[in-house]
């Protein structure tokens, strides 16, 4: 289209404009040289893109533009016209152009129809070629020659090239067939649309982007003319506009960016002409004319010998060309370096881009800059003409040189370089540097045509920069269009391509094999953030590939085993099978005897088995740390006294400290020791019990103690008595005052004294220490226990003590409450604590105490003093330590249980005090129970009533205090019918347990005390009958095997209990310290209850026969049940224990296995049976009244504690769930109490195979085992082609096979002449007719890939193998740009929670610290500030230009100046400024200048960069800051600081306009 136009001319200068888009012209403009004098010709110069007029331009000369006017040319002409002739003439011109355009368009009658969309005929061949290369990439991945990342990159590259070549074919098709095709004209004239959209209409839609901008591998091959399939339609919508909501959100974020920009710079207005600054910025180079245009020179510039351009000159376009040509450093002024305080001066700003002349005064350049920067974001977010998510690559691939015709390659010389691997997995040659002569030929292609003269195509060195890729080699034959060279366009861009990670998973389960894996393990480098957490320092070691790695996954069935009990020390898992064994389904693979290194309890809950560990485990494992524990206990618990006797408890104590309840356990053990001391009155029994405690204390000296048990006990008892006089000063005095409740403060002193005593005399002090020690650990509680022992010495004293004991109970409670507080006067503060915790408890306790005191006196008189005193002592202890008191002399085994029980109570108490109000209630209820039980001990009579009421209400009582108090009162009444009461108690206990069991089960500590026993009893009732039958049968079967031996052993045990014990101790010392301890406890218990044993002669007989096996023992118990109903209770508990330990139906099996274990440690296990809860119950039933009283408290404890406590504690802290797989068989065994001993198998597990196949191996990793089986489906058999005559021999046939057994073959590898493998794998077998291959997949790992597996790992399906890293191609779209631009404007330090490496603040600080070393402070400050300003401007402009948006540099500079206008004070000196305060740099410079003149010290400061939001909020104008964000915070601070707002800038009057109107009205 040629247009002629006449217009008037003024004095025409070379126009100072230059179209920014001129580089995008689709046509070339050629110079026209007309020698005729008529009409003057205006020439468009291609190089400078400006219009030059001949010098002899005549007035009113018509100008002729002989060129096709598209959009950009029109822009250029109108801009020049405006500059030359002003606005009025330009408006007329544009109006005329519009009319001409409409007129011509109407005449042409161009229309657009469906038939105008002509699809290029080459499309089908292009698509088929692309799909072939896609198949090749998939095969290369299958063969292990490509990584998955390279495959996807190659696919994307292939389809991108296909799409591009299709576009070119479409354009060529239009030009060749119909140059006036309306679609073609519309796109190429710039009227509407662009080539990208025409491509979608007639070629193919191409690759699509997902919402994150990443390219999808699936290209849309259709175009809009053909129509899209459903899949293609969904894909094309996925990345295009991503829905209206998305657009709305993005528009909001783009608008918010504009608002922040406006708020930050709205006050920047041109007020002054010249700030007289000495600072500026420099440009140098050949391509700086755009940068110079419109700026003002800072210094004079010498152009040549004759001309000097003075400073403060505005650089026009012609001057810019001249300045760029001289290639010198040009100093110009910039808004960054303007010296005005808050705005910019006229000369620093320079040209007004809208007017084309120097900016006027009063121009709001800040808001113009903000709008110029913010508008592209809004506009581009909304640009509906965008290509719709079609992948348009940022940085289109490298410039390529295809072969123009078929020919042969010839190189002139050897080229330096190296082979590299491209992102698409191709191996090419990288040229390191270019030749010395740029005109020299790099390579030439010579056509191989025979008929014509050969054609030659040459590529010169200057065309191919260093870093280019060479795709052909010397002498290679090339085809037309084949890629020869890719020229690199290496850009020094700081913007890194986004790096993405790709996870590679195994497609099937199997075994891993590393073929070649060059691995480097690096510990993660922690970026130095503002606050690094200490946790970050222990980071996992990462394993990277330092080069390409190859590995395989061989298919097999992997069966995982969830056991964490596999033998980890040896690092092996034992199996019944060896490699190559054939396994059928449900075959046991291996057997595990589950052994636990700790002592614990097994409990069955629903379908799972829980292992609860008791306190004992610590005793066993940590015997040697007693001294350490000792100190820990002192430090932690304010318990000053921990004697050597308490060693066992001490060891437990520190261990349990990890769990909150552990400390309590320790205390319990102490209480039990104290009980033993009380029982010292009975010489034999006392000595045994004492030994037991000592044994617990000193494992190493067990033998010696055993040998001289009687001596030691006697000595200790003597000491005790004798110490009574000595102790009266220290210990005894303490106890007496406690009893009398004379002074509590004495107790503390006494405790300290006790500690001293221990240090002085370990042996003697041990006894005393035990009692005292108890007081210390339980603080007052233990002290009370000591008093009981003294009472036992003198019956009268005992009675008195009991009275005191009533008071003591209250003391005990107080101690428990104030256990951690250590109050000086324990009585008063303890009572207070009780009151606070619950009034009911205090009242109930007090009543019980008073009644107890009275009753105890009368009862004691009637019955034997020694027995009563013992029971009384127990009662006192029980009140203090709920569980401990019950078993003082009864059972050593029960004693261990007691420990656990006491610990539970103590724990609950401590928790109450320290932690939870809710728990306090429950704990208090427990305390009441303890008191009740203790009262029972004191008054055996009351037991009767107790049995009736308590059986049903005891558990409830724990919840309701009133019921308990009633039971206390009723206790006093009945003394006569003791035995009958006992029987009732037993029955009621059973019922009681059943009723209460469900309600209390859920509670942890509470449940342990009360409900667990009940629960067990339930089990006993239900399973009891069955057990009896089963066990009896077993007896019959097994008696013949070991009757003789067993009988002998049993007899020995029964008759000579003590000597047996000594022998056992000697034997056990070497093997199991734990077992020894248990056995000791059991035997002394038997002595205590020796009468009961004698009573049941049948029991003795039964024991000898079944002794060898646990079954027999159980039978003995059964016989007891038959003999006496009283024992019946105890027996069920025994049975129930067994049941609980075993899983549901495997009880019989468990018994059998137990017999085996017994043989190993025969003596130890038998005592355990006797010493369990069962014994307690038996004693209760059979013991004399005195014994019964003692036992009854034990019974209550057993209900609440002995069974349940350890398990609930474990559920809270230590319990482990043992997860059993369904496919496996379990046989459980455990002792009666459900206790599990160390090194004794609790169950035998048979792991069964889940599949049929060939066993490969077992692997242990991370405490989990897995087995590998090769199934039939994991192998493939190839039938060899029967091409060979049948006569030929086997060997010759074999020779034809190109592979060998054990070889790894890849997809496509030739295995037989002319035949390739259709899969990858390892050859297992080669015969005459077939080859068997184990399926496998080879993988390729790229450099810097993260490896997650190790050699020979057994992997389940979808297991992560490695993480590949790649730089991802992304679409260019402002959608990706806005977050980046916002990140720069806000000077963000973090992104997605991770610190950005080399962020603005890091760069500024590091540059400033470096500059300070070299330069003086002020110079370093200016340098670093200018550095970060220029860096920020450059990065922002780069981010915009990546989106195809050009913004004038000065706009960005105005904004960046505001972001760096403040500094941070580091040291205020004489300025009264605070460190960390932000202040305007110009203001601070004024302050410092005046300080220096007054000879004071100026403030020190450092440069900072504030994001837009922070700089607005830091603004001096509080109205601006409050209108932006955080209104109330800003206004309150400003009011407190009494700030004044001077209403500078454009927006302030808007905020207060309404106020000023009101003032006028007033």
Swiss-Prot record:
Statement: the UniProt record of this protein carries the keyword Transcription regulation: no
Known catalytic reactions: RNA(n) + a ribonucleoside 5'-triphosphate = RNA(n+1) + diphosphate
Cysteines paired by S-S bonds: none
Key words of the record: Chloroplast, DNA-directed RNA polymerase, Metal-binding, Nucleotidyltransferase, Plastid, Transcription, Transferase, Zinc
Location within or outside the cell: Plastid, Chloroplast
Primary site of residence: plastid
Pfam families per UniProt: RNA_pol_Rpb1_4 (PF05000), RNA_pol_Rpb1_5 (PF04998)
Cofactor note: Binds 1 Zn(2+) ion per subunit.
CDD domains: RNAP_beta'_C
GO MF term set: DNA binding; DNA-directed RNA polymerase activity; zinc ion binding
Cofactor(s) required for function per UniProt: Zn(2+)
InterPro entries cross-referenced by the UniProt entry: DNA-dir_RpoC2_beta_pp, DNA-dir_RpoC_beta_prime, RNA_pol_Rpb1_3_sf, RNA_pol_Rpb1_4, RNA_pol_Rpb1_5, Rpb1_funnel_sf
Family: Belongs to the RNA polymerase beta' chain family. RpoC2 subfamily.
Annotated protein name in UniProt: DNA-directed RNA polymerase subunit beta''
Organism: Chlorella vulgaris
Source organism phylogeny: Eukaryota, Viridiplantae, Chlorophyta, core chlorophytes, Trebouxiophyceae
Gene this chain is encoded by: rpoC2
């Amino acid at each position: 289209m040629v247009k002629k136009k006449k217009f008037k001319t003024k004095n025409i200068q070379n126009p100072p404009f230059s179209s920014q888009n001129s580089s995008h012209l689709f046509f070339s403009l050629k110079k026209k040289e007309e020698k005729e004098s008529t009409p003057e010709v205006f020439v468009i110069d291609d190089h400078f893109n400006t219009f030059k007029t001949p010098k002899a331009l005549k007035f009113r000369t018509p100008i002729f533009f002989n060129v096709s006017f598209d959009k950009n040319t029109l822009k250029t002409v109108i801009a020049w016209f405006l500059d030359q002739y002003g606005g009025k003439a330009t408006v007329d011109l544009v109006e005329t152009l519009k009319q001409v355009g409409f007129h011509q368009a109407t005449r042409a009658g161009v229309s657009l129809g469906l038939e105008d969309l002509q699809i290029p005929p080459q499309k089908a061949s292009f698509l088929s070629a692309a799909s072939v290369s896609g198949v090749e990439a998939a095969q290369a991945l299958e063969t292990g020659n490509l990584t998955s990342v390279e495959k996807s990159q190659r696919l994307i590259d292939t389809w991108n090239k296909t799409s591009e070549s299709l576009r070119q074919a479409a354009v060529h098709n239009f030009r060749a067939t119909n140059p006036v095709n309306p679609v073609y004209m519309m796109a190429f004239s710039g009227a509407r649309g662009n080539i990208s959209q025409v491509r979608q209409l007639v070629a193919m839609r191409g690759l699509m982007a997902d919402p994150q901008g990443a390219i999808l591998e699936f290209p849309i091959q259709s175009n809009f003319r053909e129509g899209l399939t459903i899949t293609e339609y969904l894909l094309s919508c996925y990345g295009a506009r991503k829905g209206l909501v998305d657009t709305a959100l993005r528009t909001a974020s783009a608008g918010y960016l504009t608002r922040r920009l406006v708020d930050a710079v709205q006050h920047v207005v041109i007020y002054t002409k010249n700030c007289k600054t000495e600072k500026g910025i420099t440009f140098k180079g050949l391509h700086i004319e755009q940068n110079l245009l419109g700026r003002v020179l800072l210094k004079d510039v010498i152009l040549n010998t004759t001309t000097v351009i003075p400073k403060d000159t505005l650089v026009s376009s012609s001057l810019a060309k001249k300045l760029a040509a001289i290639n010198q450093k040009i100093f110009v002024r910039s808004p960054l370096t303007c010296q005005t305080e808050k705005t910019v001066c006229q000369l620093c700003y320079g040209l007004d881009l809208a007017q084309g002349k120097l900016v006027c005064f009063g121009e709001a350049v800040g808001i113009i800059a903000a709008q110029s920067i913010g508008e592209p974001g809004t506009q581009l977010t909304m640009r509906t003409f965008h290509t719709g998510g079609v992948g348009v690559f940022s940085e289109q691939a490298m410039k390529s040189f295809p072969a123009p015709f078929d020919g042969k390659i010839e190189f002139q010389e050897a080229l330096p370089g190296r082979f590299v691997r491209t992102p698409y997995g191709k191996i090419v040659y990288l040229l390191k540097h270019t030749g010395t002569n740029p005109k020299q030929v790099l390579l030439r292609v010579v056509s191989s045509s025979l008929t014509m003269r050969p054609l030659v195509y040459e590529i010169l060195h200057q065309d191919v920069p260093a870093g280019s890729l060479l795709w052909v080699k010397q002498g290679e034959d090339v085809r037309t269009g084949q890629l020869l060279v890719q020229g690199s366009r290496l850009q020094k861009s700081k913007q890194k391509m986004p790096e993405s990670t790709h996870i590679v998973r195994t497609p099937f389960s199997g075994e891993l094999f590393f073929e070649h894996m060059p691995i480097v393990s690096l510990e993660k480098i922690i970026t130095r953030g503002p606050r690094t957490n200490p946790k970050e320092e222990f980071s996992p070691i990462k394993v990277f590939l330092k080069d390409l790695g190859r590995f395989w996954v061989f298919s097999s069935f992997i069966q995982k085993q969830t056991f964490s009990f596999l033998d980890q020390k040896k690092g092996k898992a034992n199996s019944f099978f060896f490699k190559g064994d054939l396994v059928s389904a449900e075959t046991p693979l291996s057997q595990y005897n589950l052994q636990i290194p700790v002592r614990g309890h097994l409990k069955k809950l629903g379908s799972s088995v829980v292992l609860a560990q008791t306190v004992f485990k610590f005793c066993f494992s940590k015997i040697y740390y007693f001294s350490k524990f000792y100190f820990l206990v002192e430090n932690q618990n304010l318990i000053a006294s921990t004697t050597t006797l308490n060693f066992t408890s001490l060891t437990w104590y520190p261990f349990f400290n990890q769990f909150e309840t552990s400390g309590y356990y320790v205390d319990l053990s102490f209480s039990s020791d104290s009980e033993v001391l009380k029982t010292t009155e009975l010489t034999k029994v006392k000595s045994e019990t004492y030994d037991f405690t000592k044994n617990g204390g000193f494992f190493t000296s067990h033998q010696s103690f055993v040998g001289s048990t009687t001596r030691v006990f006697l000595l200790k008892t003597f000491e005790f008595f004798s110490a009574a006089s000595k102790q009266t000063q220290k210990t005894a005095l303490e106890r007496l005052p406690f009893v009398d409740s004379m002074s509590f403060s004495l107790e503390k002193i006494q405790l300290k004294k006790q500690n001293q005593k221990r240090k002085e005399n370990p042996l003697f002090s041990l006894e005393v220490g035990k009692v005292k020690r108890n007081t210390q650990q339980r603080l007052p509680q233990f002290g009370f226990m000591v008093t009981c022992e003294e009472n036992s010495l003198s019956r009268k004293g005992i009675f008195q003590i009991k009275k005191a004991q009533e008071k003591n109970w209250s003391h005990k409670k107080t101690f428990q409450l104030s256990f951690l507080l250590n109050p000086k006067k324990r009585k008063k503060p303890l009572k207070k604590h009780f009151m606070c915790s619950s009034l009911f408890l205090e009242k109930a306790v007090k009543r019980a105490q008073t009644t107890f005191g009275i009753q105890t006196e009368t009862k004691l008189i009637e019955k034997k003093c020694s027995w009563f005193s013992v029971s009384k002592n127990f009662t006192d202890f029980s009140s203090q330590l709920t569980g401990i008191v019950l078993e003082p002399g009864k059972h050593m085994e029960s004693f261990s249980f007691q420990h656990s029980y006491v610990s539970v109570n103590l724990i609950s108490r401590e928790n109450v005090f320290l932690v939870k109000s809710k728990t306090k209630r429950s704990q208090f209820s427990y305390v009441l129970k303890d008191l009740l039980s203790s009262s029972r001990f004191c008054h055996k009579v009351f037991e009767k009533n107790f049995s009736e009421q308590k059986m049903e209400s005891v558990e409830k009582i724990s919840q309701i205090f009133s019921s308990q108090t009633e039971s206390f009162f009723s206790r006093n009444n009945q003394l006569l019918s003791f035995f009958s009461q006992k029987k009732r108690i037993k029955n009621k206990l059973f019922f009681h347990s059943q009723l209460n069991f469900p309600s209390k089960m859920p509670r942890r500590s509470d449940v342990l005390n009360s409900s667990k026993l009940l629960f067990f009893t339930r089990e006993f009732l239900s399973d009891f009958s069955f057990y009896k039958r089963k066990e009896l049968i077993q007896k019959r079967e097994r008696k013949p095997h070991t009757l003789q031996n067993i009988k002998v052993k049993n007899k020995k045990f029964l008759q000579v209990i003590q000597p047996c014990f000594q022998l056992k101790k000697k034997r056990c010392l070497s093997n199991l310290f734990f077992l020894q301890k248990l056995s000791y406890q059991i035997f002394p218990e038997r002595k205590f209850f020796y009468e009961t044993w004698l009573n049941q002669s049948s029991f003795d007989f039964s024991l000898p026969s079944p002794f060898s096996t646990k079954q027999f023992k159980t039978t003995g118990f059964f016989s007891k049940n038959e003999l006496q109903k009283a024992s019946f209770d105890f027996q069920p508990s025994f049975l129930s224990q067994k049941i609980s330990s075993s899983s549901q139906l495997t009880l019989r099996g468990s018994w059998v296995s137990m017999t085996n274990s017994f043989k190993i440690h025969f003596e130890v296990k038998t005592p355990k049976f006797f010493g369990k809860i069962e014994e307690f119950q038996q004693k209760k039933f059979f013991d004399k009244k005195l014994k019964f009283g003692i036992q009854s408290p034990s019974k209550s404890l057993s209900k609440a504690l002995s069974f349940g406590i350890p398990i609930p504690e474990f559920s809270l802290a230590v319990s482990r769930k043992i997860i059993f797989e369904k496919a496996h068989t379990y046989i459980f065994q455990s002792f009666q109490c459900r206790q599990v001993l160390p090194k004794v198998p609790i169950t035998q597990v048979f792991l069964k195979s889940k599949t049929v196949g060939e066993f490969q191996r077992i692997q242990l990793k991370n405490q989990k085992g897995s087995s590998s089986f090769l199934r039939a489906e994991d192998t493939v058999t190839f039938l060899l082609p029967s091409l060979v005559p049948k006569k030929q021999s086997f060997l010759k046939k074999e020779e034809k096979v190109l592979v060998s057994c054990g070889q790894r073959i890849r997809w496509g590898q030739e295995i037989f002449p002319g035949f390739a493998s259709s899969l990858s794998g390892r050859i297992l077998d080669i015969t005459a007719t077939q080859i068997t291959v184990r399926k496998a997949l080879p993988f390729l790992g790229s450099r810097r890939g993260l490896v997650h597996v190790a050699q020979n790992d057994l992997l389940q399906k979808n297991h992560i193998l490695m993480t590949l890293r790649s730089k991802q191609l992304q679409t260019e779209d402002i959608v990706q740009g806005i977050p980046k631009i916002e990140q720069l404007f806000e000077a963000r330090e973090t992104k997605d929670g991770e610190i950005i490496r080399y962020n603005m603040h890091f760069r500024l600080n590091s540059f400033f610290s470096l500059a300070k070393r070299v330069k003086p402070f002020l110079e370093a400050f200016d340098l670093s500030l200018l550095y970060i300003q220029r860096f920020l401007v450059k990065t922002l402009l780069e981010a915009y230009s990546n989106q195809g948006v050009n913004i004038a540099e000065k706009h960005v500079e105005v904004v960046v100046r505001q972001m760096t206008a403040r500094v941070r004070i580091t040291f205020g000196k004489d300025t009264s400024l605070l460190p960390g305060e932000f202040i305007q740099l110009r203001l601070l410079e004024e302050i410092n200048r005046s300080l220096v003149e007054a000879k004071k010290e100026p403030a020190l400061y450092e440069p900072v960069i504030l994001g837009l939001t922070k700089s607005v909020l830091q603004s001096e104008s509080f109205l601006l800051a409050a209108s932006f964000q955080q209104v109330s915070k800003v206004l309150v601070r400003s009011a407190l600081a009494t700030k004044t707002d001077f209403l500078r800038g454009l927006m302030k009057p808007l905020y207060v306009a309404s106020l000023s109107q009101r003032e006028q009205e007033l």
